[in-house]
């Protein structure tokens, strides 16, 4: 089924033509079509992602032909038991096309460990360093030979995955993973991951959300330029930068061409960026949930809802009250309006990328391009200060295009321009500290909450996420004020305390933490909390590197000697 036929099908469902959008990819198995619909709606698996991550045992044409015959026999209403048998006969379990990979550049005892004064934390950091070996993946040759038999996007070089259900690469997760890998002295692994991303830009014009074809039409927060900056700073590999500077520019062009919006403020028009994914149908990896959610809105609004869900996924915050700004009940996921918001963090990331590109081109001797990106950054900075900055509150806020005003709710992303260095007022870090105090954020002792609203979504209270801790901590650390610096350290201490406590109890790191009651693995959202976990490990290593001479494991836990901690960890692993 081509997407044109998909469009006709949607029209047959009563959707207006301007709302009938193309599917996320052409595959009639992994992205749209009757097979996907019947399998996912039958709920053969608890997690919708499981089916679309399974590879085919034979060609797609043969699978579709066999399915068509089965559907005809059952008048297109196949019983669950027969569907289960069909999938078991024609699909292979998740992960068959991947093999575990131990990075060749992994080694014992990287130097940063010596910076950590607390013996318990040093032993723990060694354990985190070892986890890289568990998260390494390499694609089998069959993914390249038979790409149509898998939803995986082929990557030439091995990579580090987040962990748990996420057995493929993810875009913005990889930045914090790479920071941790560089501390672990694994620059070769980082270079391979960077090369994979650069290859994706050359092939598709952008980096998809993750390494599956059903993610192809949406990206994630644009951190590729920053990844390159950290790699070059660590290795001095300017030749690699020079070879790929044009590809970095192409990725930023994708955001300029496809994700910009004009905003009028003070009688002047400004251009800023937003998340926007004009592709229809339920997300394949959350198909049943999206299809059922669509039943709660008028038929003609369903394609818009699905596109907004994809834009929310592109933001990395899937999902959050940040985007639930439409309709009478803002806590309902059906009120999502991601594309109607101008996000502070997205524009901060792009502002930072434009500054880095200017620096890169200067370093490479191309003054014309350096000036171009310097001017782009200046234009964005002016736009952000006019549209997103609130002097009275001392923070930046997402701008609601439909309501014509800022969303003044608390989110750590409100301080992302500070982290990105995208500001002109040198006292802004101290203003940000006052904003945190006024918002009562410093009263939370186990981490910075993702919001102050408990909607049941995973990117809201009471969850706390590693990348958002980083945005605030390193943002405040830019201040020259000793007090603001001290608060940055205390926030780092709080986060390390939570990570270490949970690890000591469960011998695992998690993608998110519930900071409402002493700190434990987070919840909410569309799936169970995942272990691993790439960016959590990366940030923990970053904070241990930065504040290793000050951080402590806590009074109660400090009574355990390092050998006791190791013994406890080994025992827990043996019992698993």
UniProtKB/Swiss-Prot annotation:
Substrate binds at residues 165, 172-173, 209, 218-220, 283-285, 316, 526. A lipid is attached at residue 553 (GPI-anchor amidated serine). Pfam families: Trehalase. Keywords: Cell membrane, Disulfide bond, Glycoprotein, Glycosidase, GPI-anchor, Hydrolase, Lipoprotein, Membrane, Signal. Residues 1-20 form the signal peptide. GO terms for molecular function: alpha,alpha-trehalase activity. The keyword Glycoprotein applies. It is a lipid-anchor; GPI-anchor. The keyword Membrane applies. Intestinal trehalase is probably involved in the hydrolysis of ingested trehalose. This is Trehalase. It comes from Mus musculus (Mouse).
């Amino acid at each position: 089924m081509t997407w044109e036929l998909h469009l006709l099908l949607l029209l047959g469902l009563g959707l207006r033509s301007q709302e009938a959008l193309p599917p996320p990819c052409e595959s009639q198995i992994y992205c749209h079509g009757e097979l996907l619909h019947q399998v996912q709606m039958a709920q053969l698996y608890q997690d919708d992602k499981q089916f679309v991550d399974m590879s085919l045992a034979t060609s797609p044409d043969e699978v579709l032909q066999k399915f068509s015959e089965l559907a005809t026999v059952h008048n297109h209403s196949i019983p669950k038991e027969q569907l289960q048998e069909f999938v078991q006969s024609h699909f292979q379990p998740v992960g068959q096309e991947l093999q575990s990979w131990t990075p060749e550049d992994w080694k014992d005892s990287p130097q940063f460990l010596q910076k950590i004064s607390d013996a318990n934390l040093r032993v723990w950091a060694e354990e985190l360093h070892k986890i890289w070996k568990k998260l390494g993946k390499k694609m089998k040759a069959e993914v390249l030979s038979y790409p149509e038999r898998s939803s995986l996007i082929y990557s030439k070089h091995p990579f580090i995955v987040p962990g748990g259900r996420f057995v493929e690469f993810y875009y913005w997760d990889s930045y914090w993973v790479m920071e941790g890998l560089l501390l672990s002295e694994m620059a070769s692994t980082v270079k391979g991951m960077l090369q994979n991303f650069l290859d994706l830009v050359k092939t598709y014009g952008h980096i998809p959300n993750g390494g599956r074809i059903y993610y192809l039409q949406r990206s994630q927060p644009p951190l590729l330029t920053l990844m390159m900056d950290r790699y070059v700073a660590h290795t001095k590999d300017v030749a690699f930068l020079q070879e790929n500077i044009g590809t970095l520019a192409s990725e930023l062009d994708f955001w300029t061409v496809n994700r910009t919006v004009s905003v009028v403020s003070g009688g002047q028009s400004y251009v800023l960026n937003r998340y926007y994914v004009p592709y229809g149908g339920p997300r394949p990896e959350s198909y049943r949930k999206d299809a059922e959610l669509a039943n709660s809105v008028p038929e003609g609004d369903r394609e818009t809802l699905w596109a907004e869900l994809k834009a929310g996924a592109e933001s990395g915050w899937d999902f959050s009250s940040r985007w639930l700004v439409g309709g009478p009940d803002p806590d309902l996921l059906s009120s999502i309006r991601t594309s109607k918001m101008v996000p502070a963090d997205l524009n901060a990331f792009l502002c930072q990328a434009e500054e880095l590109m200017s620096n890169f081109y200067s370093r490479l001797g191309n003054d014309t391009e350096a000036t171009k990106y310097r001017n782009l950054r200046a234009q964005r900075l002016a736009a952000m200060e006019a549209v997103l900055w609130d002097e009275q509150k001392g923070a930046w806020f997402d701008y609601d295009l439909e309501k014509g005003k800022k969303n003044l709710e608390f989110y750590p992303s409100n301080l992302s321009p500070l982290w990105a260095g995208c500001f002109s007022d040198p006292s802004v870090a101290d203003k940000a500290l006052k904003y945190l105090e006024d918002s009562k954020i410093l009263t939370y002792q186990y981490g910075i909450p993702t919001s102050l609203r408990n909607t049941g979504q995973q990117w809201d209270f009471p969850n706390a996420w590693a990348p958002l801790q980083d945005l605030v901590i390193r943002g405040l650390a830019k201040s020259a004020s000793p007090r603001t610096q001290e608060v940055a350290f205390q926030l780092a201490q709080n986060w390390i305390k939570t990570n270490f406590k949970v690890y000591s109890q469960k011998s695992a790191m998690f993608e998110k933490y519930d900071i409402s009651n002493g700190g434990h693995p987070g919840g909410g959202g569309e799936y169970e909390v995942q272990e691993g976990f790439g960016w959590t490990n990366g940030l923990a290593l970053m904070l241990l590197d930065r504040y290793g001479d000050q951080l402590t494991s806590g009074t109660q836990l400090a009574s355990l000697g390092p050998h006791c901690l190791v013994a406890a960890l080994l025992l827990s692993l043996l019992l698993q």
